[in-house]
Amino acid sequence: MSWADLNLMPALPEIVLLIAVSAILIIDLFVKGERRGVTYLLSMLALVATGAATLAAWLPYPVLTFSGMYVADPIASVAKLGLVVATGVAMIYARQYAFDRGFLKGELFTLMLFALLGMCVMVSASHMLTLYIGLELLSLALYALIALSRESVPATEAAMKYFVLGALASGLLLYGVSMVYGGTQSLHIVAVAQSIASGNANVTLVSLGLVFIVAGLAFKLGAVPFHMWVPDVYQGAPTAVTLFVGSAPKLAAFVFVIRFLAQALEPAAVAWQPMLILLAIASLVVGNLAAIMQTNIKRMLAYSTISHMGFMLIGILAATPAGYSAAMFYAITYMLMALAGFGVLLALSRAGFDCETLDDLKGLNRKNAWYALLVLLVMFSMAGIPPLVGFYAKFAVLEAAVNVGLTWLAVVGVVMSLIGAFYYLRVVKAVYFDEATGSAGDALTVGGDMKLVLGVNGLVLLGLGILPNGLYTLCLEAVRQSLGTL
């Protein structure tokens, strides 16, 4: 392909973001302020520019470029907008916390932007190696972010665990991709699907590769039994970093799974559906039962994340447009819930004190009714209690499962959701009905921008619960326009 034939428009958001983050990295060398105001402002402007570029490049149909290795389609565009918003919110939430603990450096913002760049590459990849490159860029940025607080032993330990296990998962994924290549003679997603559908693929090699690919994907999602890193990383990393690790990458991982399973390996759905059923059930059971035993909120939310990934897998394994769109709706709403949940913990923390345990939250309503209400909104939404958006997200994926004859799996999901409600309501009980023994809510140092965004974040959970159709329709149309009628 010559430069004259190259269409750069589909990759405009990534090009804008790469130029911006490279410039910010250089400019930050000359920034002396402790609060990194210039770097922070430039990073937010970079996100605005990336969001504008995403809207400018938005098309209602897939467009391939770079010799078919890159695609701009509605799924990618919706995901990129969500990722840009999540990254901006994470930066706003993290700034004061990082300043209080001495790791507010330019690297905090530039690493988040590089992670965003990796996620954008992931969601627009139409070639398995492009997917892998985006994944590794994201992973390397996250490793560095987790270890950014160098004086923190738990953070360093968490980064090392994530790095070692992440390398293992990447190896499994690459091994599976190599087998798929051996069986189909291509790494292009469309070509792989066509080879399998036409019967020209080596079924044995593709099936073996599928096992390794699903294992690698399960690690990135944090699904059981590849979930070992999730609780340790969530608890060990600084809360400002946990906030980012536990939100935006989940949406990117969803699109990552869609590219592999719903596009490249869609003709082999009968082979990967049973594996996803096992992963979904195991994630629901282990995630909810383990969360009941936790008193550390970050660790509880880690196991909660595992159970949420189980629900998202139910939507994916339905292998229908309704199932994929329900899973996408779930991924976006989970991202919003995670941002709000960890955001409240950050707001209630201050220099010398981290709000991390149930005891810290006891009696919060008597000290700060607004933050207590935000905790209630987040916990009710995660538990799936109407009219919060979490209820409609769970309802959508369970309905998709019922519509393809997996009623028994939907019943398992409902039972696990009822069990999971216990530990969410336990947090609400501590906030509203227990005596104030913790120091959360005392001498808060929250900035006005964080107060505003956190309030909007909480109200969005309620607003999307009352009016969920707009976002769900957007997800459904994106899936239909990107994947066809399937």
Curated annotation (Swiss-Prot):
Catalytic activity: a quinone + NADH + 5 H(+)(in) = a quinol + NAD(+) + 4 H(+)(out)
PANTHER family reported in the protein's UniProt record: NADH DEHYDROGENASE
Native organism: Laribacter hongkongensis (strain HLHK9)
Biological processes per GO annotation: ATP synthesis coupled electron transport
Topology class, membrane: Multi-pass membrane protein
Disulfide bond annotation, renumbered to this chain: none
Protein name as catalogued: NADH-quinone oxidoreductase subunit N
InterPro entries to which the protein is assigned, alphabetical: NADH-Q_OxRdtase_suN/2 (IPR010096), ND/Mrp_TM (IPR001750)
Pfam families for this protein: Proton_antipo_M (PF00361)
Regions that span the bilayer: 11-31, 44-64, 74-94, 103-123, 128-148, 163-183, 206-226, 238-258, 267-287, 300-320, 328-348, 371-391, 404-424, 452-472
One GO cellular component term: plasma membrane
EC primary class: translocase
EC number: 7.1.1.-
HAMAP family linked: NDH1_NuoN_1
Function: NDH-1 shuttles electrons from NADH, via FMN and iron-sulfur (Fe-S) centers, to quinones in the respiratory chain. The immediate electron acceptor for the enzyme in this species is believed to be ubiquinone. Couples the redox reaction to proton translocation (for every two electrons transferred, four hydrogen ions are translocated across the cytoplasmic membrane), and thus conserves the redox energy in a proton gradient.
Family the entry assigns: Belongs to the complex I subunit 2 family.
Listed GO MF terms: NADH dehydrogenase (ubiquinone) activity; NADH:ubiquinone reductase (non-electrogenic) activity; quinone binding
Subunit record text: NDH-1 is composed of 14 different subunits. Subunits NuoA, H, J, K, L, M, N constitute the membrane sector of the complex.
Highest taxon in the source lineage: Bacteria
Gene: nuoN
Subcellular location: Cell inner membrane
